[in-house]
A protein has these predicted regions:
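Domain-length cofactor-binding catalytic modules of enzymes
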Residues: 1-151
Length: 151
């Protein structure tokens, strides 16, 4: 779904229809396009990682607009397709490994768990570092998984 937003293109403000495929909004606090409660912090950006390493909360740039129409990543991204993950990752061994690291797991089948295995995703911490370096969004806090439910 596209959203009508104001963006500066070649020095002129224009109303643009923005469709973010594989991305989410990441506006600065001074953009004039976010809730007043986020004017001091910038727009919250939730970046899920995987069930083993964790996720991040980021915020839009401190000031101004990033070079991606106020957009940022919205996840670590897959390194393996679901099919590849099911073929190469042992769901029972994965469950044991995650539980041994203190993460409680509830999954309907081991195959379902394999699809979402940490090895099936890119390194979320590296994605966050690159997102920050690119000026798309700023890291605020890293969250650690405690419980995973996969249906």
């Amino acid at each position: 779904i596209a959203k009508i937003e104001t963006h500066n293109i070649h020095g002129k403000n224009c109303q643009c229809a923005i469709h973010r495929k594989g991305a989410t909004r990441a506006f600065s606090g001074d953009s004039g396009q976010i809730e007043s409660s986020f004017q001091l912090t910038g727009q919250p950006v939730l970046v899920p990682g995987d069930m083993g390493t964790g996720s991040w909360i980021m915020a839009g740039p401190k000031t101004g607009q990033n070079q991606a129409f106020g957009s940022s990543c919205h996840g670590a991204g897959r390194a393996l397709s679901r099919t590849q993950a099911k073929k190469t990752i042992d769901g029972k061994a994965l469950k044991k490994r995650l539980e041994n690291s203190g993460i409680r797991i509830h999954a309907s089948t081991p195959n379902v768990l394999s699809e979402e295995a940490p090895d099936a995703y890119k390194d979320v911490d590296e994605v966050i570092e690159l997102t920050n370096k690119a000026g798309l969004a700023r890291p605020v806090v890293r969250m650690k998984p405690n419980i995973v439910v996969k249906g």
